[in-house]
Amino acid sequence: ILIYNADGQIVDSWTLGFRSAHGLSLIHEQGRDVLFICDYRSQSVVKTDMNGNILMRLPTAGELGIYEEPYKYLPTGTAIASNGDIYVADGYGASFVIQFDRHGDYIRHFGGRGKKPEHINQAHGIAIDGRSIKHAKA
């Protein structure tokens, strides 16, 4: 992670040792900035402070028992709702979106590969606006 000031100068850098970091969300909560970082190779989604301290690690699909083939969980992006709910896009895996509450507790998952309107093929990224969840279909 490289942190720049407004003049474009690097003021800090750190690493979590991820080999395939992919997807980064920056939010402001409780008076501080935090990051949500995905690493699809290790099936990890972590929340960190701006110094790289891990504040939370979300459970994997395998740990939750929600995928028939847990190795197909490859998270690529996150979006955080105004109520703190965390949405994880499984872009390189089974193409589900997994919803957690602000504490990292599983709520539900939806989407997945298929040809019906409710399916998502390659849920690579995700964003939330004030009205609804938006996702890109590939």
Regions found by a protein language model. Name each.
Residues 42, 72, 93-94, 98, ...:
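A detector of repeated loop/turn-to-beta-strand junctions in beta-rich toroidal repeat architectures
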Residues 40, 83, 91-93, 131:
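Short loop/turn segments immediately following the C-termini of beta-strands
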Residues 37, 88-89:
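Residue position within the beta-strands of beta-propeller blades
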